[in-house]
Amino acid sequence: MPRLLATQSHVVHGYVGNKAATFPLQCLGWDVDCCNSVQFSNHTGYGLDKVFGTITRETDLKELLSGLFDNFSQDYQALLSGYLPNKNSVRCMGTYYAKFKEANPEMIWLMDPVMGDEGQLYVSEDVIPEYRKLALSPKQLVDIITPNQFELEILYGGEIKTKEHLKKALKKLHQTIPVIIVTSCDCKMFDDKDFIYCVASMEGKTPIVYRVPFIDSYFTGVGDLFSALLLDRVYKILSNPTTTLKFEDQVNNVLNVIQKVLKITRSYASGKMKAKMGSALEMKEMELRLIESRDIYETINIHQTDYIYARL
């Protein structure tokens, strides 16, 4: 059974961060160890005045990761990092994840550089240099990143307004990162606002554009679930040189699973409710139904829709 260390947020109620990643990965046969970067009552979509809890101090995070490295440096097959609240926590995570990678170069690290979306930062600007150091490290520590377009622009260091800009950004980051999944791209770059566009790129191969129907509601934890499922699928490819699994098919499968989870979640909501930020009642209704979706995480368990749209 493969083992994974995940460092990201934790909520007591609901499903984001480690709460969104752990159960699906366990269903897929992973032994998951969670290191929580924050511990909140619920996610921030309920409204900032309805979130209670604490940020894990750098000294505490360091002590936890240090202990895990000293005791289990050879025990993990994969590393996952998601939301980290400040530059010190990013730096601390990066320092220890680098040690894990140096101790076991076969370990796969997926980094979700959570910084913001649609031109707005969720974190302080001093987090940016820390993520850029990790993404652009000549040591090539990170194997997979899952930024949205805004986060990709930050890592790349320039605006992305055309497909050519996108290809240049991917080419630059592929100098240090083998697998890049841009989880959402500006629909203006393509042709239809009724769809979400995702771009998957593996070093040395033509980037693939996926087009997924837009579900008109606000969900939280989707990116965390996506990263967890993607890590599982890519691990199955990279850890088995004789595999017949194809990268583009595995990404397509993850998108199918995500769509199915969102539809299941929507089906439990009252009437035609669609959640929006700051509405506690609506957010409660739209918490991801991960337990109800437990039978669909495996590739073979759901009907596959081909979301491949184009190649860059």
Curated annotation (Swiss-Prot):
Q: What is its EC number?
A: 2.7.1.35
Instruction: Kindly state which keywords UniProt assigns to this record, in alphabetical order.
Output: ATP-binding, Cell cycle, Cytoplasm, Kinase, Metal-binding, Nucleotide-binding, Nucleus, Transferase, Zinc
Cellular component terms, GO, for this chain's entry?
Answer: cytosol; nucleus; peroxisome
The UniProt entry lists the main location of this chain as: cytoplasm
Give a GO molecular function annotation for the protein.
ATP binding
Entry's Pfam families?
A: Phos_pyr_kin
Instruction: Quickly give the catalysed reaction.
Output: pyridoxal + ATP = pyridoxal 5'-phosphate + ADP + H(+)
The domain of life is Eukaryota
Q: List GO BP terms, alphabetically.
A: pyridoxal 5'-phosphate salvage; pyridoxal phosphate biosynthetic process
Which cofactors, by name? a divalent metal cation
- Entry binding sites for substrate: 9, 44, 122, 224
List where in the cell it is found.
Cytoplasm; Nucleus
Under the heading InterPro entries, the entry gives: PM/HMP-P_kinase-1, PyrdxlKinase, Ribokinase-like
Q: Which residues bind ATP?
A: 183-184, 211-223
The function of this protein is: Required for synthesis of pyridoxal-5-phosphate from vitamin B6. Important for bud site selection.
To which protein family does this belong?
A: Belongs to the pyridoxine kinase family.
Name of protein: Putative pyridoxal kinase BUD16
Q: Which gene encodes it?
A: BUD16
